[in-house]
Amino acid sequence: MQKLNVLITGGTDGIGKAIARRFATTGANLILVGRNRTKGETAAGEIIRSSGHPAVDYLQADLSLLSEVRRTAERIRRSWDRMDILVHCAGGAFPLRRTVTAEGLEWVFAVQYFARFLLTRELLDSLGAAPAPKVANIAGGGGFHQVDFPNIQGERKYDMFGAINRAGTLNNLLTLDQTTRYPDITFYNYGPGMVRTAVMKSNWLMALVFNTAGRLISRTAEEASNDVVRLLMEEWPGGFYGPSLQRKKASASADDALKLKIYSDRLLESISG
């Protein structure tokens, strides 16, 4: 039986790192993607030492940049003949003020939605080479709300929590569209709820929310990672899940998902030239 090839973006910290630790105990070949090289190499080393499992690789990439997403996908295609599992978990310290990347995209939109849209697309052949490929989009906030396309990147009005919720909604619509478009791949959308990670103390507003309410209702990264690994290793049907793997109803319309796909294709074309 072949060992699984598992790619985890954001696998160097928080929920992503906890997911990687669990997969290491299964003997899977792990590829961790993260922006900070020192943190990434340290995380890979820690997982190797704690699990006794040597097949843990780290790829440095700033996934807020589409050029880096493409470069990462190319490296993966050259080095691995297939990808059995792709876990999108990259995030980071959410900015209080609207922040724009070097390619002109709002940062939260770029990292938590657009990079996922593009990386999955770039790896379709790698996923298609696996016998039972699975993709998990991990995203907090959001719901099945209507997308305000004129403000999809906070162009008219930006606030941090609005950006987080917007990214959650976009991930929901992305999963809905992918499930229809690529029936040979199983897609999961998992909302972990409030999780005790470094992100919750990344700025004063996050820390305030965490200290007032989060301590009572939050979960650990290990608890959230257990849900994700169960989804991906057991025979759970594709779809939408919350904490403790409670099923969520996909009440979004296919029209909204299609509109987002068209918007994303056009945006990608404008950036790529």
Which stretches of residues belong to each language-model region?
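Catalytic loop of short-chain dehydrogenase/reductase
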Residues: 91-92, 96-98, 106, 128-184, ...
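A glycine-rich helix->loop->beta "capping" turn
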Residues: 51-55, 74-88, 94-100
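Conserved Rossmann-fold cofactor-binding substructure of NAD(P)-dependent oxidoreductases
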Residues: 63-79
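Rossmann-fold cofactor-recognition segment
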Residues: 49-67
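C-terminal helical subdomain
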Residues: 185, 189, 211-270
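Canonical Rossmann dinucleotide-binding motif of NAD(H)/NADP(H)-dependent dehydrogenases/reductases
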Residues: 1-31, 37
